[in-house]
Structure formats: structure tokens, C-alpha cells
Amino acid sequence: MEHNNSQSASYAAAGVDITAGYKAVELMKTHIARTRNLGCLDDVGGFGGCFGLPIAGMEEPVLVSGTDGCGTKVKLAILMDKHDTIGIDAVAMCVNDIICVGAKPLFFLDYIACGKNVPEKIAQIVGGVAEGCVQSGAALIGGETAEHPGLMPAEDYDLAGFAVGIVDKKKILDKTKMAEGDAVIALASSGIHSNGFSLIRKVFRIDENPAEIYRPCDALGGKTIAETLLTPTKIYVKSVLALLENVDVKGISHITGGGFYENIPRSIPDGLCAKIDRSAVKVLPIFDLIAKTGNIPERDMFNTYNMGVGMTIVVPAAQVQTALDILTAHGEDAYVIGTIVKSDEEKVILE
């Protein structure tokens, strides 16, 4: 016992507070409990999270995984001392990816690295993760909080995670079924989402003069740049799952880093191209402000940001209205922005 106490004291002297870790776990348990579903087989604290697979009715169940983080959006959360929504971003970046395959999220695990474990802050972060899990129907079955003194400043942290989903093999989206004349539907984004923040910090000189982002901005309808930037990434899982049950979806793209030019082609087969009507895209004011302030060419903006479109979905032209009705009923701002055309050169054209 004396040896253990001595070891703990030495660990604390090195900057790792074990007691804070225990307290953080206790504070986050209420958040985690919100995410429990029928697949959960154990409580928080075990060495591994156990989850029963819901494979009834599936011929060939396939697990689909995705991992991601929030990029330097975390820096904004730290600067604003607002940590209760950044976890939504971490979940969104993963579950929005796996839904592009047609997979329903089952569970999520998070990883937080921090300079100093402040239990209340960690609980806020995990509270956001839990909210993202609730929005996507995933269970938060585990995670890790690692205290890294000497490696990270005390106030800093990073957040990442991974999601696992399931889909029947025959229902995995197959882009080779896409055809000329199919329609491209846009799902509106909630804002910047979770990429391009290093450029944003440079454009608005946030690191040198952070006070500017807290002033109300006319271009943003009176909102501050800060609150606009920190708006959580929209989670599309439940609306897209409803769509998949009723419409012959040919392809889905999650518009993240690389914008339209990098992400839309990922769901387009060779020989076809998504022809996007630039005038149809509902560009959010924050993107116009970034472009104007940073003197950034429009193509570069569409090659970096979602520009107001968080996801694109390709459906047969004959099913467009059905798709729009379903998506609207589930709270999405959905509209047609283009069509699929033949092309052996480019896979996406904006004009």
C-alpha cells in the first residue's frame, strides 16, 4: 500500500492527476447513459466495450468503420472556453462518413488527449460526444482520456473517435449503378462543419487578435464570427437512413476537407460526372465572409469548404420529389443542385 501511495504521489508530481481521471469518469457517466441502446451489454469501466450485433433479417451483415477528429476547430473551443458541442463534431465526422456506404451507426468510442485533466471540462466534451451519439443513434460504449503533461499545454486538448456501423452486404451503395440523367440533391450544412479552420484562423487573424471574432457581424445577421464558427457539424444519419429505405440511392458524398472537388468524385463512377449548377448552391454568409476577408478565389473556396452543402445524394430523376419529401419531413433543407452527365475527363463540374 505504501508503495502504491508513493507511486501515485510521484505520478502526480509528474503532472498526471489520477484522482481527476476518476472524477471525470464519474461526471461523464450520466452523459454516456443517454446513449445506451439494445446493443449495449455492459457498463462504463470495463477493459472493452461489448455490443451485441443486430443482425436479424440480414443475409450478409457487414461492419463499416470510420475514424476522424475535429481538426483545429478544437482551438476555437479552447479559445472560447466552450466545450459542450465540439464532441458533436467528432461524432458527426465519423457517422456522416459511414452513412455514405449505407451503414447504420451502432457504436462510437472517443479519445481525448489533454495537457491537464480538468474533470468538469472533460465531462463537457464527453457530453457533446453523447449528444452526437443520440442524434445518430449510436451508443457511446467506451473511450480514453489521456493526460499529456509536457507534451501539451495545460489548457489544450485534442479530440478524435471512431464509429462502427452495420449494413447488409446487398444494400451497400454501389456507384456503378449510377446513370446519366440521375439527379444530385444537396443537404444544407449547419455552417463550416469541421474542416478548414487553420485557414480560417489565418484569414481572421484569430491567433493574433481574437477579440475581433466576438463582435456582432452584420454579414452574419448580427451573430459573432465566434459563435458561427463553433456551430456543430450537422448529423445526417437518421434522415439518410429513412431515405435509403424508400428511394434507390445511387451514391452519397460527405462534403468535408477538399470541398466539392475532392468529395463528390468519390461517389461518381468512371465515365460519369456530376454537373453542378453553381447558382443553385445556397452558399452560407460565413463562406462569403471568409472569401472576401481572405481574398480567396471561388474555386479555392469550393475546393476547401462545404459552401453550405454538407452532403450530396444521387437519386434517379423519377424519384427526386419522393426523396425531397422524405428529407424535408426529417428536417433537412434539401434541394437539387445538379445532374449526372457523361464524361471521361472530370467527375465534377461547377458552372
Where are the model-predicted features located?
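Glycine-/charge-enriched secondary-structure boundary and capping motifs
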Residues: E2-A13, K121, I125-A139, M152-Y157, ...
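Residue-level signature of catalytic and energy-coupling elements of molecular machines
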Residues: D17, D68, G181, H254, ...
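Short loop/turn motifs at secondary-structure junctions
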Residues: G102-K104, L199, D248, D333
